[in-house]
Amino acid sequence: MRIGVIAIQGDVSEHVESLERALAERGATAEIVNIKHKGIVPTCDGLVFPGGESTTLGRLILREGIDAEIKDAKEQGIPIMGTCAGLILTAKAGDSQVEKTHQHLLGLMDIKVNRNAFGRQFQSFEVGLEISFLDSPYNAVFIRAPAITEAGEGVKVLASIDGKIVAAEQDNVLAFAFHPELTDDMRVHQYFLDKLFN
């Protein structure tokens, strides 16, 4: 089992540590590799897109030629998880802010995103979030977070705040507007690992 973390930019080490902890919790093992260039994605059984600066992340993925490999992985049913900026990358469409920056989107999910959904006044916040696959609230850390403004028919909404969708799933792709790698609660990473091991 091999999990690839897009390591071009963003919260890479935090995701690696969280995945290692989540694997240890379930008594499972997997190799975790950093993806910085073409050729690694096709060797992976699961992919993680970390938070970071979405415009930079998208541009570098395109430049390195990783985008086509990611789309192929999606078509093959490889589990994929995007968090914060990673959520933006999974989208099919974005708001005017996304368009203005010529943000490269991978179109893995039938969703439209608002890049800075919670406004400048909420640079970051934490909230006890009700997520459909969890039986108790999850302490979600939001940092200049995006949100999903439109979700297509095949998209399952997992969590919302004030009418804004902040977690969703479509087929083998998971998208979270918050940073699960910044908490001690491994349940979101476990949900991703469930897709790999089941």
Curated annotation (Swiss-Prot):
Gene3D superfamilies, per database record: 3.40.50.880
EC number(s) from the headed UniProt entry: 4.3.3.6, 3.5.1.2
Domain of life (superkingdom): Archaea
Active-site residues annotated for this sequence: C84, H179, E181
Residues bound to L-glutamine: G52, E53, S54, R115, I143, R144
Alphabetized GO MF terms: glutaminase activity; pyridoxal 5'-phosphate synthase (glutamine hydrolysing) activity
Keywords: Glutamine amidotransferase, Hydrolase, Lyase, Pyridoxal phosphate
Coiled-coil parts of chain: none
Catalytic function, reaction form: aldehydo-D-ribose 5-phosphate + D-glyceraldehyde 3-phosphate + L-glutamine = pyridoxal 5'-phosphate + L-glutamate + phosphate + 3 H2O + H(+); L-glutamine + H2O = L-glutamate + NH4(+)
InterPro entries: Class_I_gatase-like, PdxT/SNO, PdxT/SNO_CS
GO biological process: glutamine catabolic process; pyridoxal phosphate biosynthetic process; pyridoxine metabolic process
CC per GO annotation: cytosol; glutaminase complex
Pathway: Cofactor biosynthesis; pyridoxal 5'-phosphate biosynthesis
Function: Catalyzes the hydrolysis of glutamine to glutamate and ammonia as part of the biosynthesis of pyridoxal 5'-phosphate. The resulting ammonia molecule is channeled to the active site of PdxS.
Family recorded in the similarity comment: Belongs to the glutaminase PdxT/SNO family.
UniProt cross-references to NCBIfam families, sorted A to Z: PLP_synth_Pdx2 (TIGR03800)
Quaternary structure note: In the presence of PdxS, forms a dodecamer of heterodimers. Only shows activity in the heterodimer.
Protein name: Pyridoxal 5'-phosphate synthase subunit PdxT
Phylogenetic placement of the source organism: Archaea, Methanobacteriati, Methanobacteriota, Stenosarchaea group, Methanomicrobia
